[in-house]
Amino acid sequence: VSISSEHDYSEESSQYQWLENDLVNANQDREAHPWLITMFHRPMYSSTESGHGSEIDFRDAIEPLLVEQNVDIVIAGHDHNYERTFPVNSETVYQTDTNTFLKPEAPIHLLVGTGGRFLYPGSSSNPEWSAHFESTTHGYGILELLDKDSIQFTFYDDDNGDVLDIFTIGRINVVTPEHTPVPSSDG
């Protein structure tokens, strides 16, 4: 599910109402829609210092709805690096396991802005909600439904195919990721 982070996203806006309605309907039958994933251009969470950073107004307006409707993953771009959060709501972290999350209480946010343009350097602040950050290599991600109760995201180095980050979310139990993540060169 996606709306524009570039246009009116206030609660009164038509796109907010559409998003709310779509998420409510999907939540009524999680058997048919086991995973709720949203996508926006601008990130709610970004620790880059030289890019645009977190879109606080957008986060304040939209994040409560995403948490209320049990959204699992939020995907964004805009800043030219890769970053993954822990499950987070209003900068409060809910689980800090680096790769496996069982029934998280808040969405995991992915910033995947590594498609080919110049990359933004990382932040020296390393916020508590940031689980993994990459700013030295272009890359891409694959989101894989392992089964109706497990979903896995893997971020790959575009040059050599190395796994740079991987995590799994489970509803009943957590399937162990098949790959071992390569430590980030950013620490």
Label for each model-derived stretch:
Residues 1-123, 130-137, 142-181:
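Metal-dependent phosphoester/phosphodiester hydrolase catalytic core
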Residues 186-187:
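Short, solvent-exposed mixed-charge patches
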